[in-house]
């Protein structure tokens, strides 16, 4: 969400940004929102003029009332009363005009704010330009991709060897897109989550368990309407939504708040279940636990000074790389192009893990800088040392999403005999186990 003043003063820049995001259908919205802003400001100015006129008339009535009270001449009294009545009629007409102007202002402002939610955030100048994720750019690789000399089964087949997953039972209970994890696979899932939590605590982040349901105004504050419709489950009859990621409730924690500047940055890491509709057709490689309606995730968010957000963005995606490399999983950083950025994002990158089975990388983390978009929507402000208020920047990144992390772990640590090596970093969370041995 952009500042209306910025749009008013830089309409061509805003339109160029829309073109860079390949959203040309939104170009007319810039002129529409400027026209609505003009209508709104015109109503405000007219209202101020009417208010001044009303005050002038009301002030004029004071002396007239005084003279009327002291006057003995009937003709003069009648004349004074007539002036007072005329002034009162003018004040009444003024009030009626004020009411109409307030309605005009409110309607223009509501329509303007609705359009402001649709106009995308200005992207960072470093973002590569392209229409979709096929134009995302590989930046750097970390770790040597593995090419085993034995076939690697699909991840659910590996899990089934340990009696670790039951997709059929979950389908009977909940439908497609759900799973039961059991035994060592379930323990591995919990180990990954706990390791991610402790990893971020060691980086200085505060551990947080947030609400798993949030109000609609928080949802609208953290994501676009398009993303909201595609992702969020609404609780019927309640102003509550199940979170799609704990970023939503962690950022929402600061709604309508004024933070002292010396309390920045706010750095939180949280665990939560996540619930997503995941609309649309999914490819054959997105079966199993890859793309599901319910999963668990460790997340990180930062609320910081605007001048610090680029440095935090760099730190945050590197935390992801460090975590995956500590588990001996090769990864790469992929810079998201303009057309692949969600409307609230200034800049974003994916961290992708190596799949020995597919001999290619797949997404496991997403790191984003949202500039002041969420802060503006949620009315999160900071009071600087000079006493002035400003909007902070917000960032988020996946620490670890165990379903996809499990895929990467199992494939990269599978042995020819069917066993799976437990990375040293996870062994304390697995009761000291160094290897998982298949049951059949």
Where are these regions (language model features)?
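N-terminal alpha-helical targeting/anchoring segments
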Residues: 1-145, 160, 164
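TRNA-recognition modules of translation machinery and tRNA-sensing kinases, especially anticodon-binding
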Residues: 27, 141-440
């Amino acid at each position: 969400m952009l500042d209306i003043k910025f749009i008013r003063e830089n309409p061509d820049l805003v339109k160029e940004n829309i073109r860079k995001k390949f959203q040309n259908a939104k170009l007319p919205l810039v002129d529409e929102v400027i026209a609505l802003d003009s209508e709104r400001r015109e109503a405000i100015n007219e209202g101020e003029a009417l208010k001044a006129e009303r005050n002038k008339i009301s002030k004029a009535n004071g002396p007239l009332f005084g003279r009327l009270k002291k006057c003995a001449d009937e003709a003069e009294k009648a004349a004074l009363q007539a002036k007072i009545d005329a002034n009162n009629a003018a004040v009444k007409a003024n009030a009626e005009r004020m009411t109409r102007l307030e309605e005009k202002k409110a309607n223009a402002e509501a329509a303007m704010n609705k359009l402001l939610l649709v106009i995308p955030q200005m992207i960072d100048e470093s973002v590569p330009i392209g229409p979709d994720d096929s134009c995302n750019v590989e930046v750097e690789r970390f770790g040597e991709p593995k090419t085993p000399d034995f076939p690697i089964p699909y991840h659910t087949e590996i899990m089934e060897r340990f009696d670790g997953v039951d997709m059929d039972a979950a389908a009977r209970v909940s439908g497609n897109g759900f799973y039961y994890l059991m035994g060592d696979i379930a323990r591995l899932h919990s180990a990954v989550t706990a390791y991610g939590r402790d990893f971020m605590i060691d980086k200085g982040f505060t551990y947080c368990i947030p609400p798993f349901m949030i109000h609609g105004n928080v949802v609208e504050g953290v994501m676009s309407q398009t993303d909201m419709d595609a992702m969020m489950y609404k609780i019927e009859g309640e102003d509550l939504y199940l979170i799609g990621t704990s970023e939503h409730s962690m950022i929402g924690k600061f709604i309508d708040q004024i933070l002292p500047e010396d309390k920045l940055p706010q750095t939180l890491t949280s665990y939560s279940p996540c619930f997503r509709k995941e609309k649309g057709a999914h490819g054959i490689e997105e079966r199993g636990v890859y793309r599901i309606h319910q999963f668990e995730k460790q997340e990180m968010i930062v609320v910081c000074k605007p001048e610090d957000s680029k440095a935090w963005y760099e730190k945050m995606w590197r935390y992801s790389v460090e975590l995956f490399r500590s588990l001996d999983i090769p990864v790469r950083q992929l810079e998201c192009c303009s057309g692949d950025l969600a409307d609230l994002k200034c800049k974003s990158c994916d961290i992708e893990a190596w799949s020995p089975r597919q001999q290619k990388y797949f997404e496991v983390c997403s790191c984003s800088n949202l500039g002041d978009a969420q802060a503006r929507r949620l009315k999160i402000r900071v009071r600087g040392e000079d006493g002035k208020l400003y909007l902070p920047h917000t960032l988020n990144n996946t620490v670890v999403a165990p379903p996809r992390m499990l895929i990467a772990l199992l494939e990269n640590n599978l042995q020819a005999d069917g066993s799976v090596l437990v990375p040293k970093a996870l062994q304390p969370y697995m009761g000291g186990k160094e290897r998982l041995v298949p049951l059949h």
